[in-house]
């Protein structure tokens, strides 16, 4: 007696039918994609700020910008954070503390340099003796965010760019792509000039006595300029 049933087709042409239970509960992906998705969706920034740029970063915590939708959870301990936003001027005295905070963060960790003072020294780069001319001389930087200070919308854009960078990383290349060196910024081209606020404007005639037209309109008896200056000098003495 022969078997009349057709043998099973190993490679059918038709599209296989997937049950509804499996179609709604199974995701086909790779371990690397899940690893990147989990990290970019749960960045935990360190609550760290040294100057006025931190006010703009703190504004993102409110309901208007609500950075919780990006999965950001602010942490007060560097051992629980994987993102540090250097918001504000970094001084020579603060530099060792910043490096120590960065070293205490677990890997993989990321850095966003926020503000002109953090990137190049900003307005303190020409004549300040204590400002660090670029935080990338201390720790490696992943995203540069210029501005004085940057608006919260710009901070959100920097976070989006960092998320894209994390999404393109590979779990097997994490050690090879890690930044192990520090960068050195170029010298600025600013020319220092003599200060304009020297205090000489206090001796201007307009500060010693009101204008004659204003004094005549208000009926104020204005003494001579020499008498006003002598009286001011005697009172100061």
Curated annotation (Swiss-Prot):
EC number(s) per entry: 7.1.1.-
Coiled coil: none
Keywords: 4Fe-4S, Iron, Iron-sulfur, Membrane, Metal-binding, NAD, NADP, Plastoquinone, Quinone, Thylakoid, Translocase, Transport
Membrane topology type: Peripheral membrane protein
Cellular component GO terms held in the UniProt record: plasma membrane-derived thylakoid membrane; respiratory chain complex I
Subcellular location: Cellular thylakoid membrane
Cofactor-binding details, from the entry: Binds 1 [4Fe-4S] cluster.
Reaction equation(s) it catalyzes: a plastoquinone + NADH + (n+1) H(+)(in) = a plastoquinol + NAD(+) + n H(+)(out); a plastoquinone + NADPH + (n+1) H(+)(in) = a plastoquinol + NADP(+) + n H(+)(out)
GO annotation terms (biological process): aerobic respiration; electron transport coupled proton transport; photosynthesis, light reaction
GO MF annotation: an example: NADH dehydrogenase (ubiquinone) activity
Residues reported to bind [4Fe-4S] cluster: 52-53, 117, 148
4Fe-4S in keyword set: yes
Domain of life assignment: Bacteria
Keyword Transport (UniProt): yes
Cross-referenced InterPro entries: NADH_UbQ_OxRdtase-like_20kDa, NADH_UQ_OxRdtase_20Kd_su
Homology family: Belongs to the complex I 20 kDa subunit family.
Summary of subunit composition and partner proteins: NDH-1 can be composed of about 15 different subunits; different subcomplexes with different compositions have been identified which probably have different functions.
Function noted in UniProt: NDH-1 shuttles electrons from an unknown electron donor, via FMN and iron-sulfur (Fe-S) centers, to quinones in the respiratory and/or the photosynthetic chain. The immediate electron acceptor for the enzyme in this species is believed to be plastoquinone. Couples the redox reaction to proton translocation, and thus conserves the redox energy in a proton gradient. Cyanobacterial NDH-1 also plays a role in inorganic carbon-concentration.
Stated name of the protein: NAD(P)H-quinone oxidoreductase subunit K
Upper taxonomic lineage: Bacteria, Bacillati, Cyanobacteriota, Cyanophyceae, Acaryochloridales
């Amino acid at each position: 007696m022969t078997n009349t049933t057709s043998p099973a087709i190993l490679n059918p042409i038709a599209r296989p039918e997937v049950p509804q239970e499996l179609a709604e509960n199974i995701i086909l992906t790779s371990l690397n994609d899940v690893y990147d998705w989990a990290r970019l969706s749960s960045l935990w920034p360190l609550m760290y700020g040294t100057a006025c740029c931190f006010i703009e970063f703190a504004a993102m915590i409110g309901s208007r910008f609500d950075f919780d939708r990006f999965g950001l959870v602010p942490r007060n301990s560097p051992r629980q954070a994987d993102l540090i936003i250097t918001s504000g001027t970094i001084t020579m005295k603060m530099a060792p503390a910043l490096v120590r905070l960065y070293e205490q963060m677990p890997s993989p960790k990321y850095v966003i340099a926020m503000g002109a003072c953090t990137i190049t020294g900003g307005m303190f780069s020409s004549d300040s003796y204590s400002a660090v001319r670029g935080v990338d001389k201390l720790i490696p930087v992943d995203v540069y965010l210029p501005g004085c200070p940057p608006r919260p919308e710009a901070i959100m854009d920097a976070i989006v760019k960092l998320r894209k960078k994390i999404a393109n990383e590979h779990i097997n290349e994490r050690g090879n792509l890690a930044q192990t060196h520090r960068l050195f910024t170029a010298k600025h081209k600013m020319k220092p000039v003599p200060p304009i606020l020297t205090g000489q404007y206090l001796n201007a005639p307009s500060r010693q006595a009101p204008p004659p037209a204003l004094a005549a309109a208000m009926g104020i008896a204005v003494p001579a300029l020499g008498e006003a200056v002598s009286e001011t000098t005697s009172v100061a003495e």
